[in-house]
Structures are given as C-alpha cells and as structure tokens.
C-alpha cells in the first residue's frame, strides 16, 4: 500500500479522499494547502499511515469536539476476498461499520477513505507546561483527572509522563481551538491550579499545532509533515494501553510514581475523554471506548540494543508497570486500544489455528460487546478466513 498515497481535498464539500498508503502528515499538509479553517480528526504522529490509523479508530487532539477519525468517515474502498473493489454502497452498511474501528485487515484490503473535514479557527493556541513531583505535579495530576474530561470541548490537555533526574516529570500539553485570551479565561475558571500564563502559550495555524504535538520546535515549517519518520531506524518499540473509569486517588498516584521511577525508561501518555466522546454510543462503530471512560493511557518503551535479551528486559519492564496499574483501570475485561497492537492480551496460536473462543480473549478487550457483531460480519464476507493475522476477527465456523 506504500504507493497508494493520493489525496484529494474538496473544500466545497468539506471532504478529503485519502488513499491508504498516505501518512497523517501528508493528509494534514494537503488539507492545510487548501484551507486554513479545516482540519482532520486524527492522531499526532505524522508518519503513521492513514489506512491502519483510521481502521482502528484514530484519536487525536480534536476528539473531545469531533470524535475519532472513524466517526467522520463517510465512505471507503476495499478489495474483498473475491477481488472486487467495493465502496460503501456496494459493500453494505454492516461491512462499512466493521472496517471503521474493527480493523480493516480482518475483512479485506483498504484502498482509500473518504472523510468529513472538521472546522477549525484560523488560529489555535497550544502550550506545554512541565511540572515535577517536587513542583506539585502529583496534586496537579489528581486535579487533572477531575477537570480534563469536563473542560470546554475546544480544550484538549493530555499528560505526557516520564522520569527525569530520578523524579517524575509531568507535561501538560494542550491544544485549544481558539485564541489565547479565551483559553486563559476558561482555564482560570476550571483549572487555576495549573498557573497558566499568556507567556506559556503560542498562537499558530492548526496545521502547525500538529507539528507542536509531534514535538517539533515552534516555527518549524509545515513541510516537515511530509518527512517519512522521525524515529531512528535502529530503535525498537513496545506499547500497551489502558482505560481509566474512576479517578486514581492521591495515594494510588503515589504508588504509580514509585514504580514509574523504578522503571526509568517508560513514557506514559494520558489522553482525556469527555465531550463528543461521551455523546457517541459504544455500538456506533466497533470502537467501544466511549461513555464511562475518563481517559486513556498509552505506555511506551523504546530501546536501541539488538538481541533477545534486550527484548525480554524491556518487555518485562513494561509488563511490570502494566501490572501495577491493574487496580486503577477498567475491568472485566481490561480494555485495550486496537491500534496499539499488544500480543500480551491474547493472540491466535502460532500454529495458525484460529477460533472464536481464542479470539474473544483479545477481541472483548478491543471491542467489548461489538466483538460478536464483528464475527457476524466476518462470517458473511470472508467465511473461509482468508484475511487473518495474530489478532484478527474469525468467522463463526472456526
């Protein structure tokens, strides 16, 4: 799919048709070339491909106002098991539902997506405030849990948490769909403890805010979105995910920080819900993580050494942190985000055997009650299970 990179933007209809091999950065750049008041409800990593990102849900900085990428997909093209190219009308609503959050690779080969563009102001405001535990960071995180899901829908404040100089550093990273003065007024009412000032903030076009969240310096040209990847080719990466439905107590946070400091190399990102994410029913798409979730957690670890020992060492560090978080996250099942592929939560046997019972172990975590409908769609469109992988959706006969 790497060569399928065409992007067609129709500002009159406020839509974009993007082929599955195009990256998010390429899509953001193309939209910005056509309009300064339209954006895309997608993620913050410019080099991520749109084909898989949209197929698994696709969340980003405007999800509290506009929902996920899949909530804004209005058409798609897919190659089915018979080699036919289908659009929304010819594939039918059940298959169209399944590929928007259920992972397109279980059902066929996604060629392209058509999505609604969302309205953004000509100027947005961003900030990044860093606070250590010694600077009151833990109390701010506790407050953030109450505030962030209930802020004005134009405000998105994520937490990036890492270990620096033997302590926890929490970065409060914000995008606001508006000017700085309005943001300061809203923050003073809702989160004065953060101590935000005008000098902390930057006003810039929406497309440049995507570079800010990708950790490019302020002033970086929009063409940087077209770069293939900022990750060193020789690096290795493992990720996991969680959903939090109840505020973690101050005492609970202390236990999290203790283990986190011991790990040294893990990064956590906490992404707030609320707003539009609480409006959309869990069954609207296969992505079920909606009402009831305060925020989502992504755990990340990166290393640069080759070999099995390095893999096992870093996997064990991440798994240990994940275990410590068990009391604080969703249960029965412990939910996970499809796009953060994680074989630890279940996978089909290595001998190629696939069945519904085995798939339900991971499927319920990714899709909750939507798993059974995904199996029904799979049974209808791919009964012989031609499209399969370690965590795919199986048909009923298997």
Segments predicted by a language model, with ranges:
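Soluble FAD-dependent oxygen oxidases
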Residues: 1-398
């Amino acid at each position: 799919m790497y060569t399928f990179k065409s992007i067609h933007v129709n500002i009159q209809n406020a839509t974009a048709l993007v082929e599955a091999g195009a990256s998010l950065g390429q899509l953001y750049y193309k939209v910005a070339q056509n309009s300064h008041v339209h954006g895309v409800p997608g993620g913050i990593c410019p080099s991520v491909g749109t084909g898989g990102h949209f197929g698994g849900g696709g969340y980003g900085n405007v999800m509290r106002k506009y929902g996920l990428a899949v909530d804004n997909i209005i058409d798609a093209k897919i190659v089915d098991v018979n080699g036919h190219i289908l659009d929304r009308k010819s594939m039918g609503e059940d298959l169209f539902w399944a590929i928007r959050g259920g992972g397109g690779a279980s059902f066929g080969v996604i060629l392209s997506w058509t999505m609604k563009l969302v309205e953004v102001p000509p100027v947005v405001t961003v900030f990044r405030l860093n606070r250590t535990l010694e600077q009151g960071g833990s109390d701010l995180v506790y407050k953030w849990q109450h505030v962030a899901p209930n802020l004005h829908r134009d405000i998105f404040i994520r937490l990036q948490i890492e270990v620096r100089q033997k302590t926890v550093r929490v970065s409060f990273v914000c995008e606001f769909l508006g000017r700085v003065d309005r943001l300061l007024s809203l923050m003073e009412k809702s989160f004065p403890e953060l101590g935000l000032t005008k000098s902390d903030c930057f006003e810039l076009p929406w497309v440049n805010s995507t570079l800010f969240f990708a950790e490019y310096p302020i002033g970086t040209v929009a063409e940087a979105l077209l770069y293939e990847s900022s990750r060193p080719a020789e690096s290795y990466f493992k990720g996991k995910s969680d959903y939090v439905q109840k505020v973690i107590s101050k005492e609970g946070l202390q236990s999290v920080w203790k283990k986190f400091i011991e790990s040294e190399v893990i990064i956590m990102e906490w992404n707030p819900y609320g707003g539009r994410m609480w409006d959309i029913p869990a069954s609207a798409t296969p992505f079920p993580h909606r009402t009831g979730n305060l925020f989502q957690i992504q755990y990340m670890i990166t290393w640069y050494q080759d070999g099995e020992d390095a893999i096992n060492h870093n996997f064990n560090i991440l798994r240990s942190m994940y275990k410590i978080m068990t009391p604080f996250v969703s249960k029965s099942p412990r939910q996970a985000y499809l796009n953060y592929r994680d074989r630890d939560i279940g996978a089909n046997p290595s001998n190629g055997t696939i069945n519904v019972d085995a798939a339900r172990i991971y499927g319920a975590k990714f899709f909750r009650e939507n798993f059974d409908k995904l199996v029904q769609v799979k049974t209808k469109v791919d009964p012989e299970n031609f499209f399969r992988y370690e965590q795919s959706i199986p048909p009923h006969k298997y």
